Each structure stands twice: as structure tokens, then as C-alpha cells.
Amino acid sequence: MNTAEFTSKYYIDRRGSHSRKWDGQHLKFSRTDLLPLWVADMDFMPPQCIQNAICNYVKANPLGYTIINPNYIDAVISWYKRRHHCNLQEDWLTSAPNVITGIMWCIGAFTKPNDSIAVLSPVYGAFDTSASDAQRHIIAVPMKRNEDNRYTVDYETFEIAIIEHDVKLFIHCNPHNPIGHVWTEEEMGQLFSICRQHNVFIISDEIHQDLITGPTAFTSSLTVKSGAYVDNMIAMSSLSKSFNMASLHHAEVIIPNEKLRSQFNAYKAHVYHTDSDVIAETAITAAYTHPEAEAWLTDVLAMVRENYEYLCRELCTALPKIRISPMDGTYLAWIDFSAYVKPEDMHDLFENKCHLAPSFGEWFGGESYATFVRLNLATSLENIKSATHSIIRNI
């Protein structure tokens, strides 16, 4: 269906639904009457087949303790093979309530207090807090931005940081939040080779893997150089981003190496005492096996791409010195306003003049990004038009 039809069928006004993005603005902002473009979830209902699967299960079954549904396992394996050319084995799969919890468990299982953990900056701020909450040190290795506003890695700088700080763990974001970069196999091969050379364990957060809106195809970290690095790696994902179900607390944790898997599960057993969420498994099985869900995802990507192209066209015409990073993956636009706005004026501009609630740049790596915002484009074109015109009008 076209984007107008998709909006009419699936867009929903979420105010009053206890949405963190819409109803939780007081948690992050100075006012509560803002158009929210911050939290990374969608303003769209999930596909009907998923809604039906959940409702049918609840109507027919009590919500008691369950064991893992083998249909769920088969659905995950099939999805990875069909969508991402990644051949998983059943015993590689374990789970966590969400990707960030899985990362925190990995930090607990594979590092010690005061160890150093590397990330490529700018990056999702929860990586930093996951490390600092566990008394580990984040080593943020800044990426370089070229004239096309694409970010690249200086591999020499990355390796020097690994050595100087005796880094034990690298958290990789693939695709990369907030910059929208979809990593190529060559790029990841260079990063992972450095990690292996210096005995650095790798976590690959692949939660945005299905949200590819540009020309670069998604490559799972698990398949880089035909799986050459899987013995030193854990990959994680979830349908929460792809099908807008973050409230269903479930993420796949994929661990090919048996020793690492045992170590992870042993740590997990100390902090978590159940391993099956029947509603999440029901939703995942429907999402990964029903043609309607896959068609819905295709329509979402078209919607997001149209929103991104509109935003870029209007902002770049009105504000020619603005810098917008190419959004090849995710539904998140990363925009630098430094040519027009001072760092100290960003919050006032967006909150009090534009009446918008973006994710502010410093949330992704500190004051170096204070003139940036990340805008969530998984909403109606009408909302994106309103936000775009407000920005142009107030700068």
C-alpha cells in the first residue's frame, strides 16, 4: 500500500496510552506539550496478524508458566536465514528481557569491575550507562565525519585505544544508532580483527537489523568472513524495533561458542529465574512467519524513507549549511545544527520555540555533540512536516 493508505490504517494518536514518548515527556524535558521525536519506537499499530496471534492465545490459554515454544525457535532461525543469510543453530539461542539487559549480563559475565569497554562514538547512550552502572569504564572512540556527513572509523585510533586502555569488551552497534550507518563486511572485518588480535570480546547489538532504508544491505556480525569471529562474539536482536513491540520484554541472544554460552547462562541463572515469555514468543512467531507482517515491514520502511527525504529536502533548502547524516538504517535522523545554533541554545530552541522533543546530541557522547539532535521518523508525514516547518521557522 502507499504511504497515505498505511498512515490511515496504522497511525495512532498515542496520547493517554502511557506511552513514554508521548506521555513521559516530563522525564526528560522542561514541558509536556511537545511533539515527541525522541524515544525510538513507532507511532504505528503492529500488523493485524500479530495482534490476532496475541489475542487468540490470551483467549484460549491462562497466562501461567510456560516452556519455550519450538515454533518460536523455528521462526527465528527461518527469519535470519531468509532475511539476513545467516544460518543459526538452535542451541545458539538464549534470551534476555531486552537487548540492553542482555548487554548488562554480558558485562557482568565477561568483565570485571574497573575493566574498560570500548564503543564507537556517537552511540546509543545506554551503552555508557550499562557500563558505568556496573563500575566499568567506557572508552569512547570518536568516529570521523567526512564531507558527505558519513562516519568512518580510524582503525589506528581504535587499536591505540584498545591497547592504551587494556579494553576487554567492544560493544558494536549494527546498524549504528544514532548515525544510521549500516556497517559493511569489510568495515566489521577490520574492527573484529583488531579485537581478536588484542583478545577483546565483542557484543553486537543488531536490534535495527530489519530497518534498512538505504543501499547498503545489512550484514550480521555473525557472518563476517564466513563466521570467522563467532567464537569471540555474542549477537543480540529483538522484534521490538522492527515491529514496534518494545513493551514485550524479549530479545534473542545468539552465542555460537559453547563455552561462552555456558558462561552467559550461568551468570543469567544468578540474576534471572525464568526463560520464557509466551506472549513475546507468540508475537515473534507471527511476525517472523506471516506474510502480512513482512509486507507491513516493507510499508514501514517506505514510510520512513519518505519522511526522511521530505525532512532532508526541506531543511537543506531552507538551511543549506545544515548537516544531515545519510540514514541507511534505523528510522533515526542525525542532524547537526552547528552552523545555525550555539550549543547552549539548543534546548531552548527545540523545546520552547519549536515545541519539539528530540533526542539531544549530548545523550550520545557528551558535549562534542551538543549541536546535534536525533529525530525519530517512524511517525506520520504530517508530524514530520510540522516538525520540519517549526525548525525552519524558528532558526
Predicted regions and their residues:
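N-terminal small-domain helix-loop-helix segment of the aminotransferase-like
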Residues: 2-98, 105
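Conserved core of the PLP fold type I
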Residues: 63-193, 210-227, 234
